[in-house]
């Protein structure tokens, strides 16, 4: 009986010891996991360096993604609002900069795609704005293109608002001056073919302003007219692939026309017509730089004529054209 009692005491003691051991081990493992998690979180918060996720490159400093322009080591890099490393041409703080397609490093004191980047890593694009027509109309005729025997009028008086009676040359100048101000704020150098309506300029004269400036983009501002009051919307005009005067510029002219038209329509909400490829425009044929002519709307449409005189809508017109120019310059 005594042996049986001792047996039960030993058995109970073993169970108690096993329970205590199990509790200690589980508590120990839990503590170890918590320590590991805390250590991992602490390491992430302190992490500094590059990471690649989903094919996109990021840089972390003390566990946080960098955004904006930063110097890392010997080079400058730029990251968008989500922390993604940027490449190619970008406007950063109203300055155009180029970041290597593979490395993301900002280029300085180099020429990329014919564009000169200064020692501060800045390229200043040149845009020539040509507000169509004038109060003083250039008289006579001029060749359609270099070496052409076909002659066209040097200029015309343009159209007039059917509802507002505002002349085309006034609206194009108004938009041109507003556009100049916006582009200058965004880091562009802007040259105007005219800043008032008291000068007579032929289409060749206007193109030569762009040629002399070696413009990165030549924007000809016009407004359309039609026999029908129902026609409305915007279009752009560029030379054709087989233009005998500026064949080498076709791709750039087309890309500029697409970018400007798409952005203009997106900002204004107007109807998108089309890109008219034509070799009948003297100003386009004589240009030696990327060129587009935008018809911003129809002054023969009472609704569109009135709308284009509203300051709020003019702001959209200006922002749309500016966005198109920038898209062309950064994408092409």
Regions found by a protein language model. Give the residues of each.
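Mature extracellular/periplasmic domains of secretome proteins
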Residues: 203-216, 281-287
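Active-site-adjacent substrate-binding region
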Residues: 249-277
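N-terminal secretory signal peptides that target proteins for export/translocation
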Residues: 1-6
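Active-site histidine-acidic residue metal-binding/catalytic motifs
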Residues: 122-207, 213, 240
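Solvent-exposed, polar/charged alpha-helical surfaces in well-ordered, non-transmembrane soluble domains
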Residues: 169-185, 208, 212, 254, ...
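Loop/turn elements at helix/coil->beta-strand transitions in domains of secreted/extracellular proteins
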Residues: 124-125, 183-191, 213-218, 270-271, ...
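Active-site-adjacent mobile loop/cap segments within catalytic or ligand-binding domains
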Residues: 220-228, 237-240, 272-332
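Extracellular adhesion/carbohydrate-binding repeat motifs centered on closely spaced tryptophans
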Residues: 7-125
């Amino acid at each position: 009986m005594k042996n049986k009692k001792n047996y039960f005491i030993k058995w109970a003691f073993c169970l108690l010891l096993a329970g205590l051991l199990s509790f200690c081990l589980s508590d120990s493992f839990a503590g170890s996991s918590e320590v590991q998690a805390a250590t991992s979180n602490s390491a992430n918060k302190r992490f500094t360096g590059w990471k690649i996720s989903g094919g996109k490159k990021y840089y972390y400093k003390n566990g946080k993604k960098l955004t904006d322009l930063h110097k890392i080591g010997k080079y400058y890099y730029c990251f968008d609002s989500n922390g993604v490393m940027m490449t190619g041409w970008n406007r950063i703080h109203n300055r155009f900069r180029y970041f290597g397609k593979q490395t993301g490093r900002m280029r300085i004191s180099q020429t990329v795609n014919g564009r000169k980047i200064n020692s501060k890593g800045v390229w200043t694009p040149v845009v020539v704005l040509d507000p169509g027509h004038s109060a003083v109309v250039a008289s006579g005729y001029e060749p359609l293109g270099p070496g052409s025997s076909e002659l066209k009028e040097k200029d015309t008086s343009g159209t007039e608002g059917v509802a507002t009676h505002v002349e085309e040359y006034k609206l194009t100048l108004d938009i041109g001056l507003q556009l100049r101000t916006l582009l200058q704020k965004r880091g562009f150098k802007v040259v105007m073919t005219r800043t008032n309506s008291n000068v007579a300029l032929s289409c060749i004269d206007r193109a030569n302003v762009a040629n002399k400036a070696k413009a990165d983009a030549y924007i000809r501002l016009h407004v359309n007219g039609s026999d029908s009051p129902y026609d409305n919307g915007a279009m752009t005009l560029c030379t054709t692939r087989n233009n005998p005067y500026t064949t080498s510029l076709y791709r750039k002219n087309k890309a500029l026309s697409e970018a400007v038209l798409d952005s203009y329509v997106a900002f204004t909400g107007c109807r998108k017509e089309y890109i008219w490829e034509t070799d009948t425009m003297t100003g386009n044929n004589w240009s030696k730089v990327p060129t587009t002519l935008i018809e911003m709307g129809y002054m023969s449409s009472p609704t569109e004529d009135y709308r284009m005189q509203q300051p709020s809508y003019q702001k959209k017109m200006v922002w749309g054209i500016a966005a198109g120019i920038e898209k062309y310059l950064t994408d092409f």
